[in-house]
Amino acid sequence: IMIWNPNKECMSREEMRALQGKRLQKLVNYVYHNVPFYRNKMQAMDISPEDIRSIDDIVKLPFTTKQDLRDNYPYGLQAAPPSEIVRVHASSGTTGNPTIVGYTRKDLSVWSEVMARCLTAFGVTRDDTFSVAYGYGLFTGGLGAHYGVENLGATVIPTSTGNTEKHIRLIRDLKISGIACTPSYALYLAETLDKMGLSKEDIGLRIGAFGAEPWTDNMRKEIEERLGLKGYNIYGLSEIMGPGVSYECQEQNGSHINEDHFYPEIINPETLEQLPYGTQGELVFTTLTKEGMPVLRYRTKDLCTLYDEPCACGRTSVKMGRIMGRSDDMLIIRGINVFPSQVESVILTMPEFEPQYMLVVDRKNNLDTLQVQVEVRRDFFSDDLGRMLAMKKALADKLKSVLSISADVKLMEPNSIERSQGKSKHVIDNRKLV
């Protein structure tokens, strides 16, 4: 079994906890003195860095939320001075301000280290040629995977997203053996392959590193069957680092967390209490070694379970199960974060519509689709088809500019969308993700 960094990935649990404790002490001291936001929060809770003596003391520390990052836009949570920041990324969220994350040179070297661990676990070697088909740019996927492939010593082809037929010809002609992309793009690649009259044997892909959106085992089987490769899950988020926070090994029963850099906890999202291993709750991460924008106990809003049983692959790190949902109402559609509240705010700007709407998310031919059903106000409802189509197009255009993905708008008659008592339900997610 190939392991990139056995010293860290196979460390005994006692040694790992001791290392995490040391790193946490150093981190708390660092943010206390460099980030006023954390110093104020800790002072309000009457905690000083001296109170943190081991990793168990993490429960004394404050949580960080997405809203905290937004409120401190752009650089309010940055701990390193601007002269130390060598790169900036931003989250793929579309509401309000994006989350701006600065990286120091050391952060980038940690990132390419954890990515090399992931790729090695998938079976990538120096002899592979690897296509990175995540978006390059502010999104962390492209460059995150790119430098991991380079660090490992394989050949990287920075394909990015875009011309899929050209991409397939490159895979065939350059004998590309691995690909990093979203699972939905992998299926789109398979469809394009069929359209071009080529078979999986013509391209010879061996390994797929798939992430940036939740996907099911059925989807994995289909991708593997149609592209002739073995697909592995990779998890990450820009607020913590980007791809490379956790990864599957050959056993594929959960994803190993790079917990010498990212300390995981599971909490009850209602009471905020830490939960034991084996219990489902909200995933929380602390960046133990980050310099640019470290975070304490960041609430990911992803629901999953942590496991600490030893793995047959020899790695000793804690594993996370599949993401089973969200503790907020965020939807991930084609890799983009979408909140029902965004749709609502667009509808509220248009007097033709009642603020009664329903989002129907589906997966057709393995691509996510979003339909927005909205009620037309009685005084705007008419038999004039041209007028109704113009209203429909106006809403679709507005939604596209706000959400960054296109939605199919369906105009509904007044009072046709069911009203609910209490918490109104605005989402029907027909994708069988669980």
Which residue ranges define each predicted feature?
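Conserved helix-loop-beta element of the AMP-binding
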Residues: 129, 196-215
